[in-house]
UniProtKB/Swiss-Prot annotation:
Molecular-function GO terms, alphabetical: amino acid binding; ornithine carbamoyltransferase activity
Family (UniProt): Belongs to the aspartate/ornithine carbamoyltransferase superfamily. OTCase family.
Organism: Lactiplantibacillus plantarum (strain ATCC BAA-793 / NCIMB 8826 / WCFS1) (Lactobacillus plantarum)
Positions with a binding annotation for L-ornithine: N167, D231, S235, M236
Protein name: Ornithine carbamoyltransferase
Length: 340
């Protein structure tokens, strides 16, 4: 077999080995270079791709659409209101139908079990564009961004501050440990990662020679961090008292003081977006008026600083997703010997 990715789904980071994840990051970098030099790479010429969305999206939808087009494939957007998905037709039946017509399926939605069922019953590669538990394509983009800035991943220190139970915290914790990145999660005790996720990360960290720190002290979390990462304080679809969440997470806001607490002038600031860094959105304006705040998980001065790389991350979603689709569906020659 010339390509050990061929026909495989990408549902969560641990579906692949650390070496395979590292390969996909480098492959994404290569595809980004081809795009920058206007070199065609239609590895999926004639393929048809279903883009199945339960949740709204800017970056994921755009990245999958452009990546598919660049690869020569035909993407078809299917939102939950377009089809009978989960209402009048089961996930299993939908998977079988889509698998009979499409060569690959992207899913962005709520339950991890949904994307797992799509992969089990469709018979084609399925790619997780986001679920409540994992966000693997975002992680590839994030780590591509880290590698572009620092030249390597192993030995870097990344601190995530905020809601430690969400998909980004899970993915950063586990995938970072897999690739030898020292990971610190700074969250209040009530919002720290699930013990099973922490145990999994610790297992990978031990093998990779990296460290995992879970702490309720934001200053401890960010000490000597090469990268600070945060995400929205309330995830899409989550029913929560905003006032209580703000009270819990305000000490973990990325601001100039927390950035300075890293002790490094070279620290970069990351966010998967969208970000409530000002009041220029309907939600931001509403919350700002209600709670007397001008920013939430990250202040605008830090978001606009030279140390932020959030829009580089956003742009890297496309080559990262392109790498996953091409590797799993493109009949490429990828010698298995490089993974031994």
């Amino acid at each position: 077999m010339n390509n050990q990715f061929e026909g495989r789904s990408f549902l969560k980071e641990i579906d692949y080995t650390p070496t395979e994840l590292a390969y996909l990051i480098d492959f994404a970098s290569h595809l980004k270079t081809l795009k920058a030099h206007h070199i065609p790479h239609p590895y999926l010429q004639g393929k048809n791709i279903a883009l199945l969305f339960e949740k709204t999206s800017t970056r994921t939808r755009s990245a999958f659409t452009v990546a598919a087009n660049d690869l020569g494939a035909n993407p078809e957007f299917l939102c939950k209101d377009d089809i009978q998905f989960g209402t009048k037709e089961s996930v299993v039946d939908t998977a079988k139908v889509l698998g009979s017509m499409y060569d690959g399926i992207e899913f962005r939605g709520f339950k991890q079990s949904t994307v797992e069922d799509l992969a089990t019953y469709s018979g084609v590669p399925v790619w997780n564009g986001l679920t409540d538990e994992w966000h693997p394509t975002q992680i590839l983009a994030d780590f591509l961004t880290l590698k572009e800035h620092f030249g390597h991943l192993k030995g870097l220190t990344l601190a995530y501050v905020g809601d430690g139970r969400n998909n980004m915290a899970n993915s950063l914790l586990v995938a970072g440990a897999m690739l030898g990145i020292n990971i610190a999660i700074g969250s209040p005790v009530a919002l720290q990662p699930a013990p099973a996720v922490v145990a999994l990360a610790q297992q990978y960290a031990q093998a990779a020679g990296s460290t995992v720190v879970i702490t309720a002290d934001p200053q401890q979390a960010v000490t000597q961090a090469d990268a600070l990462y945060t995400d929205v304080w309330v995830s899409m679809g989550e029913q929560v008292d905003y006032g209580e969440r703000i009270k819990q997470l305000l000490p973990f806001q990325i601001n100039t003081a927390l950035l300075a607490a890293t002790g490094k002038s070279s620290t970069i600031v990351m966010h998967c977006l969208p970000a409530l860094h000002d009041l220029k959105t309907q939600l931001g304006a509403k919350l700002g008026e209600q709670y007397g705040m001008t920013a939430f998980e990250i202040t605008d001065d830090v978001f606009q600083s030279k140390q932020e790389v959030v829009f580089e991350e956003a742009g890297n979603r496309m080559p990262a997703i392109k790498a996953v689709m091409a590797a799993t569906l493109g009949n490429l020659f990828i010698p298995t010997s490089i993974f031994n």
